Amino acid sequence: RRQRQMCIRDRYGFMICFFIGFAVKLPVFPLHGWLPDAHAQAPTAGSVDLAGILIKTAAYGLLRFVIPFFPTASAQFADIAIIFGLIGIFYGAWCAYQQTDMKRLLAYTSISHMGFILLAIYAGNILTFQGLMIMMLAHGLSSAALFIMSGQIYERLHTRDLRLMGGLRGQLQYLPFFLMFFVAALVGVPGLGNFIGEFLILMGSFNKYPVFTILASISLVFAGLYGLILIHRALFGEPNPEQKQHYTSPLKDLSAREVGILMICAIGLVWLGIYPQTFLDVSHSSMQWLVNSYVPVQEVVETVQQTATQLEHVEIQ
């Protein structure tokens, strides 16, 4: 019995080590501190790579290694992981609401959205896993496009400070439209890919974690707030007098190459939002394998815990 307990503890410890490694990369609160600074200092291409691809590898690592290698320990750890994810959702949204640097704002939105990813992984059913896949694709497109646009704005205004922006809607033709479109996608407007991913995750999580799911749904209000702040400060109002001296008027609008890059991301988001079944069919077999290896273990763990409690009472008597 003692050897069995040590084996269980060892597996749990190994699982925690794997989890911490991937949690830093995802990132999960409170291991997130590197991401806003990394985005703020990185060039546009680096931010696009980081937001669009690299942080998604952590979610892949959790799915590919942590859940299959340590299903029992993962099932025991699920509630704690979801609490960390929920804290990250609110913390990221609240910090994004307070930012004045455009890239730091977008970095905190990624922290908030990765909380949904953690909720999806540890809720552990086919709906959340499929929603996770759609959300990673959609977030990769929308966040990458917004980091591209932050670079485009910086080339024209020589600043990322939202307090020094304003009035772009009246000076440019294409940039305001794309900025509003991708912000709408990021906050989960229906008809675009992010909405499908969030909807599937929340629907799949509700049966087992109704309270956590309701709280995660409330956080979407903060997403709308930071999205509106970004759009209002950048596009509306009057141009900041302090900033006018740093660029020549009129501003140069997006080139055909820049529009083409953004159109690719926009088409992908619309496709994900209108016809996600294309991607769901491809991922279904892999996600079902994960469900089969994880969900039964959750049920076994609950049964074993109940049996152990009953045996303890019998021994005491």
Question: For the regions a protein language model found, what residue spans apply to each?
Answer:
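Hydrophobic transmembrane alpha-helices and their helix-loop junctions in integral membrane proteins
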Residues: 1-5, 9-233
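Cytoplasmic/organellar membrane-interface segments at the starts of transmembrane helices
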Residues: 172-175, 228-317
